[in-house]
């Protein structure tokens, strides 16, 4: 929790749910999130489309999109946090007003399935968004990131974005970061929401998925000629793969597709872990071999 003497009033934050609606049992977590954000001087404003009403839907695609746009249009809202995940986020893409988003000074935060919205925003507007799940801040594992979140969001620090990496090949990643969840990113293939890959650093991570699934996702990216266009790859965590020790690993699989001269780095701090940090999609990132590995040891 932020020191009350140093607390900065940050205004209001819109809370949306563009993907699957929240189940009833999430009520306590969301109340804890409300209390936490209020406690650091950030007033949360929840859309009416938060909880599941019809199967996993909190509202229609148009309703969920309009609830997001209402926060972009509201001058009292300074930032927007999406607290959902699952499968439904790409439903809202046709109903978003990208001109309004482009002209706003507000940054969208979300993760997992919100990879679709985040990359669509970049593709259509050139604006960056933050790949991060704010609900993690009130979990037992994620509470350790509260100080970093507060310093980054309220005091213009960078703690939440400072990630450790280990290079698998090459010594530096530099460019505009795109991507996120590998499965969800591929939903955009062939649509107007697919980002330009030229010269970009591609972030890939996943919650579920075994070796065959990772192989087919990477193969699709390869068939889209993504690996011929990008300047480098940043691998986040692949939860199911790493938890079960599946082989070959994603680090091994990726080398079948990328040129040996393409820089590839691994971080344990971006992905679905409750204690994950954040990255800005659509913004410049520079990572080099002087970063530390997961054990805190200097690389390179």
Protein language model features and the residues they cover:
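ATP/NTP phosphate-donor binding region
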Residues: 1-76
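Charged helix-capping and loop-helix junction motifs
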Residues: 29-30, 61-65, 216-221, 246-255
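Short internal beta-strands
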Residues: 46-48, 110, 230-237, 265
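Active-site histidine-anchored catalytic micro-motif
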Residues: 57-168, 176
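ATP/pyrophosphate-binding catalytic subdomain of soluble kinases
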Residues: 146-222
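Glycine-rich phosphate/diphosphate-binding loops and the adjacent beta-loop-alpha structural elements
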Residues: 202-203, 207-208, 234-243
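ATP/nucleoside-binding phosphotransfer catalytic cores, i.e., glycine-rich phosphate-binding loops
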Residues: 237-300
